[in-house]
Amino acid sequence: MKLIVLIFFLLFINLNYCLKIKEQPKVGGIDSEQPTNSFYIENGNFLMNNQGNGGSLNQYQIISGSFHYFRCLPELWVDRLTKMKACGLNTIQTYIPWNVHQPNGFNTELVATNDLIEFLRQAQQIGLNVILRPGPYSCAEWELGGFPYWILEQQPIALRSSDSVFISAVIAYWSRLLPLLEPLLFTNGGPIIMVQVENEYGSYGEDKSYLETLLTLLQKYLGQGDGNGSGVLFHSTDGPSAQMLFGSKLEGVYQTVDFGPMPIEQIQDNFKIQQTFASKPTPPMNSEYYTGWITNWGDASAARTDASVVAQGLDDILSLNASVNMYMFFGGSNAGFMNGANSNSPTTNFEITIQSYDYDSPLSESGDTTEKYFAIKNVIEKYIKPTTNSNSTLPPIPSNSTKVAYGTIQITQATSLFNNLANLVNSNQQQLQTGAPIPMEQLQQSTGFVLYETTMNIAQSSQLSITELHDRATIFINDEAIEDTQTIGQAVFLQRPFNSSIEITYPSNVTDDGNFNLRILLENQGRVNFGPYLNDRKGLLSGGVLSGQQYLGPWNNYPLPLTNKTLSNINNWEQIKDYTLSNTPTFYQATLSLNSTNDIGDTFLSFTGLGKGQLFVNGYNVGRYWNVGPQRTIYISSVLLHQGDNEIILFETLLTQPIFEIQFLNQPYFD
């Protein structure tokens, strides 16, 4: 009897031990003995089975908003995400720009992936699912549509195609990126419910081999995504036309459409078009419902869409039991040099996206709730359905940030670009001498400026012509800018695509043999991000510079990416009262002194009195400013400021007169 009891006791201990082993979760949070999360399409509806929320199967209406993590400082993510959740959203959508995570060349290690993963985890912790758009093409009014600059080093190359060179680069990138995302799929306990294949490809081409290659790669690393709860749901996004939907159609990929506010009859028509190539009923979904629009430098005014119009369109969409993603819900900023551009004709059109990506979104660039936010919230609350396994009460809305008008502060020091060339050339990028000026890409440079330098002679023609200019050039004769006779105090510049030639005046201080120095400061104003002209290399292209009918040369090429590292090397500072070189590209320095942490808040630098250039705050490249408008201020987050002295640096490229002061306001201004 004792033996039988002992045997049963040992069996019980062994069984209990086995059960404890089975209780250990897999990577990604899945319990090996529990049913996994699932998200799939059935009978024209999204169905979700969320084990972390009771495990019941429910219809799911996606109410999503776009938030690009790369347009917002990480310290501010939780605030923006929480405000999105508090508005009633259950999902967010974001791109993953290739140039953010693999900026340094083909087959190189990825960077900033921890930031991406942290962003996705924060979204999940706040209760938001994620629609992911991993590229390889993004658009997004972002530099080169998200492609890294080095992809253009290979010429010719066909982007967004089955071109073997392009595909090999995609494979090298995705083979590193996608495995990092797999544990974060909804079926693995993460927040990712949908993954987009390419981006609005129907507006671009019909290379099915390319799309099939992308889908095969996604399935290899993220699962088959069969639409029945296995893996992740793959989808595409296109405008509501049969032609566009045909261009991106792939077997097993759920097709969605995108459009802005319009009458409900047109919305219904668009959702009918969405079903054109569907083999079974699918949920109607607008995956880019436009809450605002793009603004470009030189526009008469910033793009605006009335809050009531946006809210009515959203109400109509949700009333049809359709799902929606609002593009954008929070826009953010194009920090550094990362704004995109558009061109529908290389010879007549080049539009540059402004530094602010406010987009007239429900959350402003500084993260403030707006009239549009509350109009949208009122609509969403009509459609939030309480369930037995979730609390439909929305969280409280976080307060808006403190805004401070620091007023006018004095410029204290200045120094010329030309006195700092050796300091500013990146240690990995040396000055090169070539027969003709070479593009940025051949200098292994992504963004910023290039200075081209050569020698001319007074015997040569004074008519200078640049054969192909991308994008903006300022001419210096013996280190002095050619002044604009129409706009006093500004330098003459050549601007793509409007003008590429100039009549120069010979200087009086030439050498004995008649030689003088010619310098051209070239600015990359943002690579094209959409359309047929994506192969947008930067610099002086196609032969270089003509004096009359003669090509000039040889040339010294100085790459000037103006990174945080190179910026710290600036020296030869002079007191502003003694500075006499303001008709050259100039760095200006000022100090914003904050006595305590209570003094720190968001602020806005006014462009008043400035020309065109770049703003740096404590070494951080905040972005471009330009007096053509309609953007008139540049947002500076309190995250960039600290107690004590804060260094403000302007790199001014347009004005030929010195700058003596700058002004900080407590609100943004747009024309």
UniProtKB/Swiss-Prot annotation:
Task performed by this protein: Cleaves beta-linked terminal galactosyl residues from gangliosides, glycoproteins, and glycosaminoglycans.
Chief localization: other
Enzyme class: hydrolase
Pfam families: BetaGal_ABD_1 (PF21317), BetaGal_gal-bd (PF21467), Glyco_hydro_35 (PF01301)
Protein name (Swiss-Prot/TrEMBL): Beta-galactosidase 1
Domain of life the protein comes from: Eukaryota
Entry's localization field: Lysosome
Sequence similarity: Belongs to the glycosyl hydrolase 35 family.
Cross-referenced SUPFAM superfamilies: (Trans)glycosidases, Galactose-binding domain-like
InterPro entries for this protein: B-gal_1-like, BetaGal1-like_ABD1, BetaGal_gal-bd, Galactose-bd-like_sf, Gly_Hdrlase_35_cat, Glyco_hydro_35_CS, Glycoside_Hdrlase_35, Glycoside_hydrolase_SF
Any GO CC annotation of this UniProt entry: vacuole
EC number in record: 3.2.1.23
Active site: E200 (proton donor), E288 (nucleophile)
GO BP term, pick one: galactose catabolic process
Keywords of the record: Glycoprotein, Glycosidase, Hydrolase, Lysosome, Signal
Record-linked PROSITE patterns: GLYCOSYL_HYDROL_F35
Reactions mediated catalytically: Hydrolysis of terminal non-reducing beta-D-galactose residues in beta-D-galactosides
N-terminal signal peptide: 1-18
Glycosylated residues, chain numbering: N228, N321, N391, N400, N499, N509, N564, N595
GO MF annotations in UniProt: beta-galactosidase activity
Gene: glb1
